[in-house]
Amino acid sequence: MSVFRRSVQCVGVLPSILAQRSSLLARPANLQFLKTNSSKFVPQVTANVSRRMYHKNVLDHYNNPRNVGTLPKGDPDVGIGLVGAPACGDVMRLAIRVNKDGVIEDVKFKTFGCGSAIASSSYVTTMVKGMTLEEASKIKNTQIAKELCLPPVKLHCSMLAEDAIKSAVKHYRSKQLTPVGTTAGAIESATA
């Protein structure tokens, strides 16, 4: 590997893009300039790029996520939705606690994914708290995407959030249909 390419990697600039101009940049004077001045301009370039990539609403929910955590899986008033997107590796776990009136009184999430996935999870938890199960089941990913100003390439994150809340509601309802002390498998075999 040439001195130029090693220097560029240390600076954090993409070597494949600059390699086309290596004859100009590989001059000793230019290499010295990069070594002495890289810390002055590279962080600013990085900061400007990251600010442009995400909308302020996404950054707010990403930097200050609301309702992070878990709820006990064994609690009969808790429903859990676990969804994932194989294409990008995002995984969301969303848990809801429902009161006796069918209103979601607490919501928690844990998400492994990009900033848009975390922001979508955080936003949907603030959205559904206080809703009935029926209202929460009607949430559409377009509402989430519109509020967070997600670009088309990140719409799958809002779809995951929609799927997670619907899965949590479905899980909660299935737990309510299962009599205490039995399992769903035992009920199915008893009725067959």
UniProtKB/Swiss-Prot annotation:
Which pathway does the record list? Answer: Cofactor biosynthesis; iron-sulfur cluster biosynthesis
Transit peptide interval: 1-53
Query: Which Gene Ontology terms of cellular component type are present?
Result: cytoplasm; mitochondrial [2Fe-2S] assembly complex; mitochondrial matrix; mitochondrion
Q: Does the keyword rRNA-binding apply?
A: no
Q: Which Gene3D superfamilies match?
A: 3.90.1010.10
Q: How is the cofactor bound?
A: Binds 1 [2Fe-2S] cluster per subunit.
Q: Which InterPro entries does the record cross-reference, listed alphabetically? A: ISCU (IPR011339), NIF_FeS_clus_asmbl_NifU_N (IPR002871)
* Location in the cell: Mitochondrion; Mitochondrion matrix
Biological processes, Gene Ontology terms: [2Fe-2S] cluster assembly; intracellular iron ion homeostasis; iron-sulfur cluster assembly
Q: Does the keyword Iron-sulfur apply?
A: yes
Q: What is its main location?
A: mitochondrion
Recorded hits in SUPFAM superfamilies, A to Z, give: SufE/NifU
Q: Name one GO molecular function term.
A: iron-sulfur cluster chaperone activity
Q: Which cofactor does it need?
A: [2Fe-2S] cluster
Q: Which UniProt keywords apply?
A: 2Fe-2S, Iron, Iron-sulfur, Metal-binding, Mitochondrion, Transit peptide
Report quaternary structure and partners: Homodimer. Component of the core Fe-S cluster (ISC) assembly machinery.
Function field: Scaffold protein for the de novo synthesis of iron-sulfur (Fe-S) clusters within mitochondria, which is required for maturation of both mitochondrial and cytoplasmic [2Fe-2S] and [4Fe-4S] proteins. First, a [2Fe-2S] cluster is transiently assembled on the scaffold protein isu1. In a second step, the cluster is released from isu1, transferred to a glutaredoxin, followed by the formation of mitochondrial [2Fe-2S] proteins, the synthesis of [4Fe-4S] clusters and their target-specific insertion into the recipient apoproteins.
Sequence similarity = Belongs to the NifU family.
- Name used for this protein in its record: Iron sulfur cluster assembly protein 1, mitochondrial
Species annotation: Schizosaccharomyces pombe (strain 972 / ATCC 24843)
